[in-house]
Amino acid sequence: MTNPDHTCVGAISGSFGVRGEVRLKSFCAEPSDIGSYGPLSTEDGAQTYTITLTRPVKAGYAAMLSGVATKEDADALRGTRLYAPRSALPSLPDDEFYHADLVGLTVLDTGGEVIGTVASVANHGAGDILELSGPGLPSGLLIPFTLAVVPTVDIAAGRVIVDMPDGLIGGDKPDTSDTAPLGQDFD
């Protein structure tokens, strides 16, 4: 969805039971908040659903969606991403960001040289990761979204500043002076 007025807050991972409930995966910091952001819409905005969380289940919630009455209706929605109006989401502290706000920002190194852009943001459990894209960058370059690696995020200016770890791009070589060759120990 290219609509900046909406943010993806969850996805339907399938049906739950035989009464039209869906299995809902929440992308919210507080997962149960997904039910409080008002009607949620599909990516294209063609469908809008009122969400009622019925109970927690493995990897999400069982939920009833308005207009979904049968298991077949729920099965048909598998993989559907749900979007909330940006105005319904809480404002964040200065050091927190919505993933959607980071995608597309220009990435600069600490010397002010343009490296590329933020292609996506992911979190697989150990913290946020930025995927960078741009000329001269390896395809799918991933960096940790930590204060040490990304000391500056300026949404208003449309940029992030990255202190790139040695060895990730270009001719940088990691410092291996404190490592022994494979199979040997330091004395």
From Swiss-Prot:
Family the UniProt entry places it in: Belongs to the RimM family.
The keyword Ligase appears for this protein: no
GO-annotated biological processes: ribosomal small subunit biogenesis; rRNA processing
Provenance organism: Jannaschia sp. (strain CCS1)
First-listed, main subcellular location of the protein, grouped into a coarse class: cytoplasm
UniProt name for this protein: Ribosome maturation factor RimM
Keywords carried by this UniProt record: Chaperone, Cytoplasm, Ribosome biogenesis, rRNA processing
Record remark on domains: The PRC barrel domain binds ribosomal protein uS19.
Subcellular location: Cytoplasm
HAMAP family: Ribosome_mat_RimM
Region Disordered: start-end pairs: 167-187
GO MF annotations in UniProt: ribosome binding
Family matches, as NCBIfam families: 16S_RimM (TIGR02273)
GO CC annotations on file: cytoplasm; ribosome
Domain of life (superkingdom): Bacteria
Function: An accessory protein needed during the final step in the assembly of 30S ribosomal subunit, possibly for assembly of the head region. Essential for efficient processing of 16S rRNA. May be needed both before and after RbfA during the maturation of 16S rRNA. It has affinity for free ribosomal 30S subunits but not for 70S ribosomes.
Domain PRC barrel: 94-168
Higher taxonomy: Bacteria, Pseudomonadati, Pseudomonadota, Alphaproteobacteria, Rhodobacterales
Family annotation (InterPro entries): PRC_barrel-like_sf, PRC_RimM, RimM, RimM_N, RimM_N_sf, Transl_B-barrel_sf
Quaternary organization: Binds ribosomal protein uS19.
Gene3D superfamilies per UniProt: PRC-barrel domain, RimM
